[in-house]
């Protein structure tokens, strides 16, 4: 459960991401594909090379979903309901992949926002991303 301090930290950190959200989302996906090659199996139709338009496009979708989650942090299940349905019923993404992408996103944010990425912010973002993952996998049951 996110504390009020966690919510404040997440909103402040995501605010610093600003117009780079899509870029950071794509970078996190690239990190995931390189570090965890089995995740590529969900994207057989994508050009997964560095800087590809498809990876950039999906990175923007990831970032937009996270922005939606930040904006609706008190009601993520409702805000992410359609996305949860998509991943559970149509795409059938293995839930472990949300943890892998979350890790890669944390690394990406730490690399780009070193001053903001304090231990407290790191912990808050980690809890937030775990909450997003829980919401996205809630309809698997």
UniProtKB/Swiss-Prot annotation:
Keywords: Acetylation, Heme, Iron, Metal-binding, Oxygen transport, Phosphoprotein, Transport. This is Hemoglobin subunit alpha-1/2/3. Belongs to the globin family. It comes from the Eukaryota. The modification N6-acetyllysine is found at residue 16. Red blood cells. SUPFAM superfamilies: Globin-like (SSF46458). Heme b binds at residue 87. Involved in oxygen transport from the lung to the various peripheral tissues. It comes from Macaca nemestrina.
